């Protein structure tokens, strides 16, 4: 798809309504990983205190469009789902412009044996308050409740808006593609458990940071779970057929996928392999994998 000609491209720089309490401003950062761009959400009614979810990349044009759109408004909270470079860096400029509190996920932490963060994490992220699973912030006519959904990243949060039975899903559920799970910070077992956690909820609509709203959430999540189980089975089958390295598996499993996405696919295959190894189903010697 030519992202420049996608209907969403007309939305760049304009704050557009999604529901009575939700508006979206699309950043002009389309790519094979962000689809048409990062969707920055504004929650609340004009003239009252607002929350901004995922302010987006450190892009002057997007930040200017956001601050212009919110001129004369009161922003009480800047809410972060996770600390990737297309989601959180604009929080610094938006906080400086509005004085709002930065809240949401915890900063990524270092392990004893090295960084958990991947190359795309935001080192500038410094929240005023970290929200744990089930904790909420409030504004006039709205509540946002944190739902811890590790997997894409260890610190990923979704945010429920109970007034509209809506869930802001960040990158845990995207409206156009499956989510990349990239070790060491991404974890496939956590991702699958977090999808199952969403199945136990009764949200009516998802607002992903990338892509369009998901209006049949339960069906969509079941599809994502089935897709990942299918990929897991493909990994096991590939090893059984003698494809014992990740490059060989990716070439076979993702032959019909844009090759620009193959490095990300390799990270997700690695996440599957690590999960299978922990479960005692596969083993590795250096970069070669075998059935255990």
Per-range role (PLM):
Residues 8-9, 13-73, 158-170, 175:
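Conserved beta-strand hairpin/beta-sheet module of binuclear metal-dependent hydrolase folds
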Residues 18, 97-98, 202:
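Short, structured coil segments at secondary-structure junctions
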Residues 21, 66, 210, 235, ...:
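Residue-level signal for inorganic ion chemistry
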Residues 35-36, 57-142, 165, 215:
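Active-site HxH/HxHxD metal-binding segment of metal-dependent hydrolases
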Residues 48-52, 57-59, 116-126, 143-232:
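Metallo-beta-lactamase
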Residues 81-87, 152, 210, 272:
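Histidine-centered divalent metal-coordination motifs
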Residues 237-292:
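C-terminal regulatory/interaction regions
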